[in-house]
């Protein structure tokens, strides 16, 4: 009789294979105290598995053409979104439904639209609820992985809407093999099949449907022409995706032992070591073959060798020895590289390598269990107390493994082909047109024309129509980006001007970009005893002057041709506010006599204007004075002298003097410059 420790191990072993069905019903104290820590292990492994979608996305986007990089990443996103919705509604129920009247060895029934009951009556029901959530999350992550495998097979050829529907159907197709292999009522579970981490129920299903899909869709345009060379758009992304998948498979294989308590942490460690040893064997074999065959290290050989070796070890990872994993991974790498020329010869266009990585490797992995499986005293129930051909010299386990592999291949291929056929005949359609394939899904499906599309246009010869369409899309994309950038710059400049204006008005100090403090003069406001000066647009705009009584003398002198400088001297007298100066007064100051309007009786402003010409120079000088009757209270003088590149005819004096000439039209076209904004002097300048 086994001791207490042995009974715990045996109880744990039962849970390892039966916890896939959450309602195990075991209520022994030994199992009860394992629930909590083991649930944490399962949930953590599920988180790691979800990161594999990033790896699939990078691997596939780096393997397809540049014009479809974004589209293939989007497909990996919808795999989780709509695939998860499909699994929640029906997939989990078909795999682990527990209604006795409807479930059978071939399909489960019940638990649709997953929502477990919350019965807090006993400890057993509480634990079962926790196991239910953990099991659902883990199985959901595995099911969406099977759907993601198919996305690489249909890359660049399937419509996005059609692929979303196909992904949901793949989830439902995968639900039945999961029931056969992992549910305690499953047909192959009862026969003693061994598949710890989804070699058959995940990778075999996704691989065979991917093969059927890529054959059904036919090769990409010009894929197998004599001058066609298949190149990765971004080998860097593909290698990064390989690393992420490498990391994620530790979560699948080590998490498939379903816990760490009761000695199962040793099983998790064994699965992790088997994973790394298989990848080492596969990678070393792929590198050797690449150097021998091509004298170079081919990136696709390296990726296929590593990933295919990990897939092949998933079925036996928890009971494998390190040298078992090394041999299994090496053989899987050979198969994955050997199948590549066969695919080219048969004109099977597999952009990402779904067939060598998932299909051939999963078949070999299931067969390897029947050869290398060793009975373990802690996992005796997992292998039904059977060993492989190498240890028992019996073909019994190998025969069960072959039966399971053949049944899943036939079922998945048939249902996958039926789904593809129905979708292709539906109004949605399945394959993109030749024109849409040339332009790329990034433009057609998402309206994107970024640098990846531009790079593809430069690298690939396109027809005139396609080139024009893509060029137009790229131009539109660049204009939109430039417009958005310009709007951001304008908004930033506007905010900066507002900040400076507020600082200028308040008289505070601000710091410029160099860290120096800028002191602004304080505007005259009513609070400090003076009225704020108001800016006028001048008579050229509204024919009126600001409501201030002004006494002004404007003197303009233009130097000779030797200097080309222009000097202005302006004297302004600010008086008490009076009514606006009538338009005819302003017109009399700037217009010739023949164009001046009649005198106004309401005007109390006098105008004096004279034009002088120095006898010693050709400089003309005009003095204009506008005065009003009230007494003067404040006088301020501002003198400015600055070079001006405008021609001399732009000044008001030149316009008036030249209007006297016959056939002169300068005054009709030259616009008087707007007056400058004036502010009273600061009697207390900053130190």
Curated annotation (Swiss-Prot):
It is a multi-pass membrane protein. It comes from the Eukaryota. Keywords: Ammonia transport, Membrane, Transmembrane, Transmembrane helix, Transport. It comes from Caenorhabditis elegans. Residues 521-544, 549-568, 592-687 are annotated as: Disordered. PROSITE patterns: AMMONIUM_TRANSP. GO terms for molecular function: ammonium channel activity. Residues 614-632, 648-665 have a biased composition (Low complexity). The lineage of its organism: Eukaryota, Metazoa, Ecdysozoa, Nematoda, Chromadorea. This is Putative ammonium transporter 3. It is found in: Membrane. SUPFAM superfamilies: Ammonium transporter. Involved in the uptake of ammonia. InterPro entries: Ammonium/urea_transptr (IPR029020), Ammonium_transpt (IPR001905), Ammonium_transpt_CS (IPR018047), NH4_transpt_AmtB-like_dom (IPR024041). GO terms for cellular component: plasma membrane. Residues 549-564 have a biased composition (Polar residues). The chain crosses the membrane at residues 39-59, 77-97, 134-154, 162-182, 196-216, 240-260, 272-292, 299-319, 323-343, 352-372, 404-424. One of its GO terms (biological process) is ammonium homeostasis. Belongs to the ammonia transporter channel (TC 1.A.11.2) family.
């Amino acid at each position: 009789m086994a001791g207490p420790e042995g009974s715990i191990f045996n109880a744990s072993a039962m849970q390892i294979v039966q916890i896939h069905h959450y309602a195990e019903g075991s209520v022994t104290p030994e199992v009860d105290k394992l629930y909590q820590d083991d649930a944490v292990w399962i949930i953590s492994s599920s988180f790691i598995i979800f990161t594999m979608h990033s790896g699939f996305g990078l691997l596939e986007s780096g393997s397809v053409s540049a014009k479809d990089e974004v589209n293939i990443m989007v497909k990996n996103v919808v795999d989780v979104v709509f695939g998860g919705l499909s699994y929640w509604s029906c997939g989990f129920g078909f795999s682990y439904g527990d209604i006795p009247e409807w479930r059978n060895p071939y399909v489960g029934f019940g638990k649709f639209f997953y929502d477990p009951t919350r019965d807090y009556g006993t400890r057993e029901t509480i634990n079962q609820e926790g196991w239910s959530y953990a099991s659902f999350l883990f199985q959901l992550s595995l099911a969406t992985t099977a759907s993601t495998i198919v996305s690489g097979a249909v890359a660049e050829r399937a419509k996005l809407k059609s692929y979303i529907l196909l992904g949901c159907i793949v989830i439902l197709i995968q639900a039945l093999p999961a029931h056969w292999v992992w549910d305690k009522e499953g047909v192959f579970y009862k026969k003693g099949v061994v598949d710890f981490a989804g070699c058959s129920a995940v990778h075999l299903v996704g691989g065979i449907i991917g093969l059927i899909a890529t054959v059904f869709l036919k090769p990409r345009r010009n894929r197998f022409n004599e001058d066609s060379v298949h190149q990765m758009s971004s080998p860097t992304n593909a290698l990064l995706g390989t690393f992420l998948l490498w990391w994620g498979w530790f979560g699948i294989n080590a998490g498939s032992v379903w816990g760490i308590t009761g000695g199962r942490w040793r099983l998790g460690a064994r699965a992790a070591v088997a994973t790394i040893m298989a990848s080492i064997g596969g990678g070393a074999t792929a590198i050797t073959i690449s150097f021998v065959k091509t004298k170079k290290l081919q990136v696709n050989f390296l990726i296929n060798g590593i990933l295919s070796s990990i897939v092949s070890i998933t079925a036996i990872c928890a009971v494998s020895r390190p040298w078992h994993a090394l041999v299994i991974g090496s053989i899987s790498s050979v198969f994955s590289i050997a199948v590549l020329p066969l695919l080219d010869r048969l004109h099977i266009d597999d952009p990402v390598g779904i067939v060598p990585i998932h299909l051939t490797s999963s078949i070999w992995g299931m067969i390897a269990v029947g050869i290398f499986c060793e009975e373990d005293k802690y996992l005796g129930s997992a292998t039904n107390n059977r060993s492989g051909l190498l240890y028992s010299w019996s073909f019994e386990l190998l025969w069960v493994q072959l039966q399971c592999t053949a049944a899943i291949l036939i079922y998945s291929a048939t249902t996958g082909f039926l789904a593809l056929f129905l979708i292709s005949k539906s109004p949605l359609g399945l394959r993109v047109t030749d024109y849409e394939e040339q332009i790329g899904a990034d433009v057609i499906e998402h309206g994107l024309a970024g640098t990846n599309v531009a790079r593809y246009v430069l690298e690939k010869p396109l027809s005139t129509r396609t080139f024009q369409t893509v060029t137009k899309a790229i131009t539109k994309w660049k204009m939109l980006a430039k417009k958005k950038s310009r709007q951001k710059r304008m908004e930033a400049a506007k905010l900066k001007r507002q900040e400076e204006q507020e600082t200028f008005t308040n008289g505070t100090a601000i710091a410029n970009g160099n860290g120096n403090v800028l002191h602004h003069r304080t505007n005259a406001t009513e609070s400090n005893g003076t009225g704020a000066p108001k800016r006028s647009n001048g008579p050229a705009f509204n024919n009126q002057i600001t409501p201030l009584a002004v006494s002004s003398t404007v003197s303009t002198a233009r130097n000779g041709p030797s200097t080309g400088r222009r000097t202005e001297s302006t004297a302004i007298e600010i008086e008490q506010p009076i009514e606006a100066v009538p338009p005819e007064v302003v017109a009399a100051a700037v217009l010739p006599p023949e164009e001046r309007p009649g005198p106004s009786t309401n005007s109390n402003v006098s105008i004096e204007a004279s034009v002088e010409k120095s006898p010693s120079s050709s400089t003309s000088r005009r003095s204009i004075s506008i005065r009003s009757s009230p007494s003067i209270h404040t006088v301020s003088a501002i003198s400015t002298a600055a070079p001006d590149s405008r021609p001399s005819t732009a000044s008001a004096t030149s316009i008036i003097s030249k209007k006297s000439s016959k056939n002169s039209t300068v005054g009709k076209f030259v616009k008087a410059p707007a007056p400058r904004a004036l502010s009273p002097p600061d009697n207390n300048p900053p130190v």
